């Protein structure tokens, strides 16, 4: 179960619905992937986990390495570059390549978003569709838009038979 900003950290609403659903199916195992703002919320559950919840994984949207000094260099190979193009330019996205790239332990979101390859793909998008606005504004907007995506792709996502997203 993928829960954005709610279960098991907030009482009521969507969280209440998720908790009721999990309890209604005790014969099924559930793993929670909770997307939360930052590590300050980690483990502060408002619900007691039912026995059929085997794990809670957390993904943090404000967990970025921007401030760790000098940016590491990253150079994408051709397949990774095309996958990045596909997601930014709206082509048929090569999710397998993006997941593989982002799941590497040494992968740096900072290095990707501040790197040459990201810059060139954004520049291509800008020239094709958005050249009427200031490029620096566009570049930083694109970094802000894609940061949450790459944070989630960098998170260890548990294997499951079915993924259900609620928000």
What are the roles of these predicted feature ranges?
Residues 1-114:
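N-terminal subdomain of nucleotide-sugar transferases
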Residues 91-156:
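Long, low-complexity, polar/charged, intrinsically disordered or flexibly structured peripheral segments
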Residues 88-91, 154-166:
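Short N-terminal targeting/anchoring amphipathic segment
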Residues 8-10, 140-143, 162-163:
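Short, flexible loop segments at the rims of nucleotide/cofactor-binding pockets, characterized by
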